[in-house]
A protein has these predicted regions:
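Conserved N-terminal beta1-alpha1 strand-loop-helix module at the mouth
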Residues: 1-88, 142-143, 147-150
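Hydrophobic faces of well-ordered beta-strands that scaffold small-molecule active sites
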Residues: 8-16, 39-43, 62-68, 94-96, ...
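Glycine-rich, proline-tolerant flexible connector loops at the mouths of alpha/beta enzymes
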Residues: 30, 34-50, 69, 94-112, ...
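Alpha-helix-loop-beta-strand connector modules within alpha/beta enzyme cores
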Residues: 45, 49-71, 106-133, 166-193, ...
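Catalytic cores of alpha/beta
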Residues: 52-53, 71-85, 136-147, 170-177, ...
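Glycine-rich phosphate-binding active-site loops on the catalytic face of alpha/beta enzymes
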Residues: 65-69, 88-103, 150-165, 189-225
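Conserved anion-binding
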Residues: 78, 83-84, 93-154
Length: 225
């Protein structure tokens, strides 16, 4: 099967989340994401306003900010504060990390209550919840999937890219098999090539998170899968 690179890009959140990311890096990433019509540019909380400003200059591009990133174990109040600030700065999408430790400890009610609060705060915006699958058992992945679906989030996202592993075909297939109505899948972490990204889209993902697919040397062509 063939898939155009431009289609892959249209489903990709172009990320600039490395610890050394600067304001200039974010502005450049925003311009590139807009130029090639990515789904969004995904940036640290402190640079959301800069990305929004660059997006106004560059043209149509959505700005996504991350919260509770990358470990997920800040308090619910801290996540709410972080998200509220990003929405005020102009973010249209939020990628927030699940409290992985609470999930693994069986504190289901805590996780459920937090997710409901975050969904209420982001009503009218795109909310993606990062499950960080590399740390979860199969049963925990399915529990995360259910809780994220029940809260009304838009996406379950596989990984931050900062854990012990990234997106896998096995995890995406598992999520796709048990996916609740209305929930979509974002694969992220370790996706380095267009071929990898295309495979995840074929498996049923609606979004890809990647930092290395776009550059000024991009050339449109079809991908052989």
């Amino acid at each position: 099967m063939d898939m155009k690179k431009s289609f892959v890009i249209s489903r990709t959140d172009h990320t600039v989340l490395k610890q050394t990311a600067s304001r200039a890096d974010v502005e450049q990433a925003t311009l590139i994401a807009a130029r090639f019509k990515a789904a969004s540019v995904c940036v640290p909380p402190c640079y959301v306003e800069d990305a929004v400003r660059a997006a106004i200059i560059a043209g149509q591009i959505r700005v996504c900010g991350v919260a509770g990133f990358p470990n997920g174990y800040v308090s619910t109040d801290a996540k709410i504060f972080e998200i509220a600030g990003m929405l005020e700065d102009g973010a249209e999408e939020i990628d927030v990390v699940l409290n992985i430790g609470a999930l693994k400890a069986g504190e289901t009610e805590y996780v459920k209550t937090e997710l409901e609060a975050l969904r209420a705060l982001t009503e009218g915006y795109i909310l993606k919840v990062i499950a960080e699958t590399c740390f979860l058992t199969r049963e925990e992945k399915l529990l995360a999937l259910k809780l994220i679906g029940d809260c009304g989030a838009d996406f379950i996202k596989t990984s931050t890219g900062f854990g012990g592993g990234g997106a896998t075909e096995e995890d995406v297939s598992l999520f796709k098999r048990y996916l609740p109505d209305g929930l979509k899948i974002k694969a992220s972490g370790g996706i380095k090539t267009f071929e990898q990204a295309a495979k995840f889209l074929l498996l049923g993902c609606d979004r890809i998170g990647a930092s290395g697919l776009l550059g000024n040397d991009f050339i449109e062509e079809e991908i052989k899968i």
